[in-house]
UniProtKB/Swiss-Prot annotation:
Record protein name field: Putative 3-methyladenine DNA glycosylase
Keyword tags: DNA damage, DNA repair, Hydrolase
Enzyme Commission number(s) from the entry: 3.2.2.-
Organism: Clostridium botulinum (strain Eklund 17B / Type B)
InterPro entries tied to this protein: Formyl_transferase-like_C_sf, MPG, MPG_sf
GO biological process terms on file: base-excision repair
Top-tier EC class: hydrolase
């Protein structure tokens, strides 16, 4: 069952933790890709210097952050990579959760070819773990880019999130790659499933 709209209309911390174990579904090139969300980070613009929406900063790039929860926010970094976020809260809240890592569940050859131009069986053990163990890696594997910005995630389309009854222990720790964010560096707003091998950093 697809997660409903109400799931997303909550605080980013709740949504980021709640997304763990849920299933990201991508339909592309006639193929259905599914990945279990195993790592997320929360960003709350009103108090978070690491957020693109800190202090109400609104630009064309950050506008999705100010929409009602349940849409995709995809941005481009370093002129090379994309990152996929799930917007949370009410309109104008400036909140969201970065999807940091997935555990791929099917169509391994497709995502392996996307990432490494090799079939899954040709990959080393290390490379198999690296298919989707980072925000840009999962975007490459699942073909997520700027065309997916603003997409509604609570309706069936080519990008949505399904519920799951996954049981797991959640680890809470600091976020990655935000050395500029002053006191927000220490916020324990990164969440991951304990002992999952696809987590980007433990």
């Amino acid at each position: 069952m697809i997660l409903n709209r109400e799931f997303y209309k909550r605080d980013a911390l709740e949504v980021a933790k709640g997304l763990l174990g849920k299933i990201l579904v991508r339909e592309i090139d006639g193929v259905i890709l599914r990945g279990k969300i195993v790592e997320t980070e929360a960003y709350i613009g009103s108090i978070d210097k690491a957020s693109h929406a800190y202090n109400g900063r609104r630009t064309e790039r950050t506008e999705p952050l100010f929409k009602e929860g349940g849409i995709a926010y995809v941005y481009f970094i370093y002129g090379l990579y994309h990152c996929f976020n799930v917007i949370s809260g009410e309109s104008d809240d400036g909140q969201g959760a970065l999807i940091r890592a997935l555990e791929p569940l099917d169509n391994f050859d497709y995502i392996s070819l996307k990432r490494f131009n090799k079939k899954f069986e040709e990959l080393s053990t290390v490379k198999k773990r690296e298919l989707t163990n980072g925000p840009s890696k999962l975007c490459m594997a699942f073909g997520i880019d700027k065309k997916d910005n603003y997409k509604v995630l609570y309706e069936k389309g080519d990008l949505y999130i399904e519920d799951s009854c996954d049981n797991h222990e959640i680890i809470e720790t600091t976020r990655i790659g935000i050395d500029y964010a002053e006191e927000a560096i220490d916020f324990p707003w990164r969440f991951y499933i304990k002992d999952n091998k696809y987590v980007s950093k433990k």
